[in-house]
Regions:
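ATP-binding glycine-rich phosphate-binding loop
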Residues: 18-40
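ATP-binding pocket architecture of kinase catalytic cores
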Residues: 42-151
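A glycine-centered beta->alpha junction motif in the catalytic cores
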Residues: 58, 109-126, 168-176, 290-309
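Juxta-kinase regulatory segment immediately upstream of eukaryotic protein kinase catalytic domains
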Residues: 1-22
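Active-site acidic catalytic loop and adjacent metal/ATP-binding pocket
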Residues: 33-53, 86, 193-243, 351-361
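A cross-family kinase active-site recognition segment
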Residues: 125-183, 205-207, 307, 361
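ATP/Mg2+ or Mg2+-diphosphate-binding catalytic cores
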Residues: 174, 292-361
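Active-site activation/catalytic loop segments of kinase-like enzymes and analogous catalytic loops
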Residues: 239-270, 286-302
Length: 361
């Protein structure tokens, strides 16, 4: 079964092989990294009339990494943190192997795949400070579970290694045009030096199990509360990695939004204010790693079709400009202001948390 050519019948056959028979209705969902399908079932499974089947990109994760992600999701669900965990697969026909305890990962038809419940919702609207505080409480609860033990197999955020890997991949692959290469390389090396210096200054840095890619597109608002449905990028890293993508604007606006998030977050986890200085370094790393991700996936026809601008002189010129802006931003915001939420962040008492209508109680 060719990963890039998965069709509805192949998806139905794969689900049927683990005891989930579809009724013929299959809808492909948006996903660049994996192939994801919504499938309606003939008979409901664990109360679900439709499920989401995820076929993992070959070579992207090891079995151990996928199972560790599944285990984390199940642990969060057991702690009543609103996530959509993988479903336990009921059986395996000959030729299909089930992995995990309980079994949540199927290996068969030349692929690895898992199944979860379908979960609908809308993107959060965070103009309301109350919604920001609510989202902060949600992330705080997720981190309260995440800090109990480290990931063994998932990625551990390492700015030096991650940045250098992205830089090497882009240079060795010849993705940067000769006309843009000198200016881009200079900006990139200067930016990575600033990133590494910021992380060095924040040591010792406490890390924990994270969502890893916590932006508004990965958070669903449902029944008056936030949920997450995608833990593909779960990693070990500093708490701020799950917070910084939820704030935007100039320095003052971001500081205010972060303070509001932390009013909720601090009810469950203390926050090390030194990590505020990592927001712009993390943004810089994300920019560079995004370019490297596009480069790594360029042989997949989906990527040239959806990212035609990648590799053009204009793209790299823009990247150079943005990297220079990030160098300045790191210098200007090496330490963000500590706001009035500090007493909540540093005096968190999980036993007295107020759920305040989150839907967690």
């Amino acid at each position: 079964m060719d990963y890039s050519q998965l069709d509805p019948q192949q998806v139905l056959d794969a689900l049927d092989a683990v005891g989930l028979r579809g009724d013929g209705r299959v809808l492909q969902l948006n996903s660049y990294e994996n192939r994801v399908f919504q499938v309606f079932l003939e008979d409901a499974h664990e109360g679900h009339s439709a499920v989401v089947a995820k076929f993992y990109r070959p070579g992207r994760w090891s079995d151990a990494q996928i199972l560790e992600e599944h285990s984390f999701a199940l642990e969060l669900a057991a702690a009543e943190v609103p996530v959509v965990p993988p479903l336990v697969l009921p059986l395996a026909t000959p030729g299909v192997q089930l992995l995990g305890t309980p079994p949540t990962l199927a290996c068969g038809f030349g692929h690895r795949y898992g199944v979860s419940a379908r979960c609908a919702g809308r993107e959060p609207e965070l103009e309301d400070p109350a919604a920001l505080r609510q989202l902060g409480r949600f992330i705080g609860r997720l981190h309260a579970v995440g800090r109990k033990r480290p990931f063994e197999h998932r990625h551990h955020l390492n700015p030096r290694a991650d940045g250098q890997r992205a830089l090497t991949l882009l240079l060795d692959g010849g993705f940067v045009p000769d006309t843009e290469r000198p200016a881009w390389l200079q900006a990139c090396e200067q930016a990575l030096t600033a990133v590494n210096a910021a992380f060095d200054a924040a040591q010792p840095l406490t890390t924990l199990r994270l969502h890893g890619d916590c932006h508004l597109g990965n958070v669903l608002w449902r029944d008056g509360a936030p949920h997450v449905v995608d833990l593909d990028d779960a990693m070990q890293g500093p708490a701020v990695q799950d917070l910084w993508m939820l704030v935007s604007g100039d320095h003052a606006t971001m500081a205010q939004q972060l303070n509001t998030l932390l009013e909720g977050y601090g009810q469950f986890c203390a926050f090390d204010d030194r990590q505020r200085a990592l927001i712009e370094p993390l943004r810089t790393l994300r920019m560079l790693r995004h370019s490297a991700w596009l480069a790594e996936r360029w042989s997949d026809p989906t990527f040239p079709r959806n990212f035609p601008f990648f590799g053009t002189a204009a793209y790299w010129n823009q990247q150079t400009t943005q990297l220079r802006e990030q160098i300045e931003a790191i210098a200007e915001t090496a330490r963000m202001d500590i706001g009035p939420a500090a007493r909540l962040r540093h005096g968190a008492d999980e036993g007295t948390a107020n759920f305040d209508g989150d839907g967690f109680a």
